[in-house]
Amino acid sequence: GIVGHVNLLIGAEKTKSVLKSHLKEGGDLFKGIRHAGGWDHHYELSNSHHNPPKNLYSNETFLESLNELSNMNLSFEAWQYHHQVNQVRKIAETLPNLKIVLNHFSGPIGIGPYATKKEEIFEVWKTDILKLSKYENVYAKLGGMAMPINGYEFHKQASPTTSDQLIQAQEHYY
């Protein structure tokens, strides 16, 4: 299916209108939207590709727009950083009929100030993901853990990363 995008900060009514347009064009293939919320206060890190404001996933306008997705039985693909998992949990709790797809393992950061804290990050991530897993409206899409921000430096290799290399580096996340 097709996963599109709507800037959910435009408000519920405008979101509903844009979603109707997506449905008109995509028909049954249109399944929902993705809105990245990855934000971090460290200057050496980039925020996710939508350059979201801090606490996007708890913004009232954003949540009202998410409710429109839920009302239309469309999914919300969330991508945020490891320290924002609880924001997704609050969405799952607030909007229990909204189908939420967690992208990229919730973005464990492994560069900059987080480069030396990978084990600590994993333990917090594991606890937060376990809490999130209690919500039946949350699904996980595996992948996206080989990005430079994850700190594995696969992009610096001369040849493509193998499955064995991925498993060796990331097996505890699976």
Language model region names:
Residues L29, L98-K99, Y139:
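Secondary-structure boundary/capping positions in well-ordered alpha/beta enzyme cores
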Residues G1-Q84, K90-E93, S106, E120-I121, ...:
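Active-site gating/metal-coordination segments in enzymes
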Residues I109-Y174:
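H/E-rich (His + Asp/Glu) clusters that bind or coordinate divalent metals
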Residues T94-N97, H104-Y114:
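Long amphipathic alpha-helical scaffold regions
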Residues M72, L95-P96, Y135-E136:
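Helix C-cap/helix->beta junction micro-motif
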Residues I100-H104, K141-G144:
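Short acidic/histidine-rich active-site segments
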Residues K14-T15, V88-R89, P113, Y152-E153:
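A short acidic (Asp/Glu
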